[in-house]
Amino acid sequence: MHPPFPQPTVVRADHDDPDRPLVVLLHGRGSDETGIIGLSQHLPADHSYVAVRAPIPAGGGFAWFANRGIGRPVPESLDQTMAWFRDWLDPLAPVGRPVMLVGFSGGAAFAGGLLLADPSRFAGAAILYGTLPFEAGVPTTPGRLAGAPVFLAHGEADTVIPADLLHRTWDYLLGDSGADTYARKDPGGHAITSEAAAELADWIMKRS
């Protein structure tokens, strides 16, 4: 059982069509759903898009988990918020409807946690300018994501996410995880670039 988090607050890009693949957008720590929903304007129109507000108040916005440090979730907290998220997702997208996760920063760690916890549940995940949740109660063993589609984008000048976590995420997703990873590095910092958004759109379209 997870704590009594509020019912998820969501914003949709358009009317949800249950016959379309669902793309769930996950914002960064201290932000909310209203910022990241704009990314959907740059992504394929034949998908349904929904942005979800994280359940934990943090920094004038919201967070997906309690931290032991930037990019390092408290395992119990991550487990609780993932259970809360799945309680919301499963009625909306029963097994059989493709679901892709797109997470930025703290939302990337949350998306990674969901994928690592249950790789077969998701049609893919985009890890944007963030880290996977290592030592956070989800498996990061060799082959854990065998064949799973992953889009990975990092900024070479990112000063928000610790460099060791960025390197570890890059190495794992392009190596031991077994994921089918498309990866790019931008010269900039901790922000989604227009080039990354365009490549993400192409990646989503090719996996529909």
Regions from the PLM with identified roles:
Residues 120-133:
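A conserved short beta-strand
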Residues 38, 113-117:
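Active-site signature of alpha/beta-hydrolase-fold catalytic machinery across serine-
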Residues 61-68, 130-150:
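Flexible "cap/lid" loop of the alpha/beta hydrolase fold
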Residues 151-154, 158:
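Short beta-strand/loop motif that positions the catalytic acidic residue
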Residues 20, 97, 145-150, 179-180:
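Short, proline-enriched alpha-helix->beta-strand connector loops that line the catalytic pocket
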Residues 164-208:
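C-terminal catalytic histidine-bearing segment of alpha/beta-hydrolase fold enzymes
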Residues 102-107, 111:
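Gly/Ala-rich beta-loop-alpha elbow adjacent to hydrolase catalytic centers
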Residues 2-95:
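Serine-hydrolase catalytic machinery in alpha/beta-hydrolase-like enzymes
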